Structure formats: structure tokens, C-alpha cells
Design a protein with these regions (language model features):
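Active-site neighborhoods and metal-handling regions in enzymes and metal-associated proteins
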Residues: 1-177
């Protein structure tokens, strides 16, 4: 089959602090963080990716949390392998910066013919990752009343680590559009 893996999430401003926010009547405004989470189905298999940008000039706090989430996402993606509990590295980076309470979901999930499959890549997850699995790596920081940042890639777990499957650019600094 083909189509979309799930209803896309497009959330801006304070609504970007809702990890699974859906479209609303809120207009996208200058200065807003804008989170876009989307996926497609190709040949029966799902995909999932998220990027966060800023509409216009970014507030210093938006830059701070983007930089933090970016560092956590890259570190976890680089370290993930069948023996490693990847959630811990991202969670530690975010917690050490004082935002641990604002990373309220697991690091990721399996993706296959369904958008959310085992394994859970989370401190709540059971068991280890296995070579051949496809998982997401999607840390986030969500500040109620301000906004949120999530960066998500899909990874193929190998014997020695992971190969990033997502081809969409992931800027090291918050992109102002």
C-alpha cells in the first residue's frame, strides 16, 4: 500500500509543546516554533520523521532547547546498537541541562507495517534491540506555555550500531524560516 503512516502533526507556538498535538484554528505566527511530524507508507511499510523549525527570529530559549535536543538526538543515534540502552544517553543529556522533567516520552519505537511496533526504545522498554530492527530516535523537550522541540529520524539497527535512514536534512542549529 501507499499513503500516509498517520495524520501529520503540525503544531506551532505553545501548541508545539503537545507531543501529539493535532491541527487547530491557531494561526502560525512570526516567532513560533513549528514542529512537523509526518510519515508515508511505501510498499506496505511505514515511515516516521519529525523536524522543528522557527518561523522568523527564534527566541534564545527556543535556540537553547533546539541545541539540547539536537545534541541528545545525535548522541543517541551515534551510540545506539543491539546492546545499548539508547534512551539513557538522550535522557541524561536532557536531564543534566535541567530539562529532564520536560522529556515526557520514550526515545523511540519500532516501525514496520504499523507505525508503532515493538520494540519500545524507552526506559520502560523490555529487552534489547536486535540487528535488523527499524526504530525511531526522537528525543524532545516540551515547555508548556512556550513550545517544544522534537527531532526524529528512523534508524536501521546493525550488529555494530545503526544506519540513519531519514534523508531529510537535520540542521545543527535552529532553522529560521
Amino acid at each position: 500500500g501507499s499513503g500516509t503512516s498517520f495524520q501529520a502533526i503540525v503544531a506551532s507556538g505553545t501548541r508545539s509543546a503537545l507531543p501529539h498535538g493535532v491541527a487547530s484554528e491557531k494561526l502560525i505566527e512570526n516567532g513560533d516554533l513549528l514542529t512537523i511530524d509526518m510519515g508515508a507508507i511505501w510498499d506496505g511499510y511505514c515511515s516516521d520523521m519529525t523536524r522543528t523549525v522557527n518561523v522568523g527570529k527564534a527566541a534564545p530559549k527556543a535556540r537553547e532547547i533546539y541545541d539540547l535536543v539536537y545534541r541528545a538526538q545525535v548522541a543517541a543515534s551515534d551510540a545506539i546498537d543491539p546492546e545499548f540502552e539508547a534512551d539513557k544517553i538522550a535522557r541524561d543529556i536532557i536531564s543534566e541541562a535541567g530539562f529532564g522533567a520536560f522529556f515526557g516520552h520514550g526515545l523511540g519505537h519500532g516501525v514496520g507495517m504499523d507505525i508503532h511496533e515493538a520494540p519500545r526504545v524507552s526506559y520502560l522498554g523490555k529487552g534489547k534491540l536486535a540487528a535488523g530492527q527499524i526504530v525511531t530516535c526522537e528525543p524532545g523537550v516540551y515547555l508548556e506555555g512556550f513550545g517544544g522541540v522534537r527531532i526524529e529520524d528512523m534508524l536501521h539497527i546493525t550488529q555494530n550500531g545503526a544506519q540513519i535512514l531519514t534523508q531529510t536534512p537535520k540542521p545543527a542549529t535552529l532553522l529560521e524560516i
